[in-house]
Structure formats: structure tokens, C-alpha cells
Amino acid sequence: MTDLRTAPVPGLRADDHVRGADDAPLVLFYGDLACPACALAHERLRSAPVRVVFRHFALKAKHPRALALAHAAEAAAAQGAFWKLCDGVYADQGRLDDPHLWARCEALGLDLERFDADRRGPAAAARVRRDVTDALRAGATGTPTVWIGPGGAELLDTMVTFGIREARRIGPPTDGWARKGSTYEH
């Protein structure tokens, strides 16, 4: 019989992209730099009092620029600019093509020749492939995928709990939302 359980979420690695206080709660974020939902999650996590670990879950079938942007982020990381590049890409989802990417890298002061060689090199491809493989093995099915804490508690339960709490805080819907049984439709 085949074991269909997912593998555990890999723990923190020395080469992970990490931002936030060492003593803050750990959030593992598998994201796609071309994903608008990831951009929203990125902005929310950026302002939260958490320690974020970013790993690539580049879904080229859904976002054609996903792999190119993931490789670019790794090339920027080689020059100490991973988070700056990600922040810029997520803040401007309408400009993901190469001319805008190059302008962004130039504005960050990156060595453009090195950046180009690194983004096309085997290290960036291997890193992105490892992250994507780990995400799939751990059960990720889309982006963004977020796990909380070292045990890798999947965020779905947390999102549902948060959604219920926020719905209670906000109150009944207004502005065109109509109640249909126990749900609301717009």
C-alpha cells in the first residue's frame, strides 16, 4: 500500500530568507513573486510582529513569470538584496517584466552583470527547485501557503479562526450584500 501522507515541513535552514525578530513567532511563507494573493499576504506579514521565512513556490503554470522572478530574487540575495527586491516586486505587481525588473535592480544598486549571471546560474535554479519540491512534499497546493511555528501547523485553521473573529468584529454586511440563509452573497 502506498503511503499518501505528506512529508513534514522542513525546519529552518541556514540559507533561508528570514526577516523579523529572533524571538518573534515563526511564520513559514511559501510564495510566488508573480502571485497577487502572495503580494497581499507579504504586505500583511511585513507589518506583523512575526519572524517570516520566505521560500519559493513558483507556479509557472499559473504565473508565467514565476520562475524568472524566483531566480531573480535568488540572484538579488547573492548581493544581499533579497527582501528589497521582493518588497519591490510585491508592491508593483503590474510591472513584472524584464525591463521593470532591470530598472528595479539598478535602483537597488546591484551589480547587473553579476545579477544576470546569478539569475541564469545553477545555484538559483537549484534553490528554487528545492523550495518548490519541499512545498509539494509538505502538502502545499497553491500560493500563498503559510505554516506557523516550528511544527509547521498549516495556516488554514488559523485563517478560519481569524476570519470568524474579524467577521464578528466587523458586524453584519452592508453596501449591497444580501443574506441568503446562513451566508451572504454580493
Explain the meaning of each model-derived region.
Residues T2-D3, A58-L59, R129-D131:
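Short secondary-structure boundary micro-motifs
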Residues T2-L4, G80, L96, L110, ...:
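Short coil/turn linker and secondary-structure boundary residues
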Residues D3, H17, V53, E166-A167, ...:
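Intrinsically disordered, low-complexity sequence elements enriched in Ser/Thr/Gly/Pro
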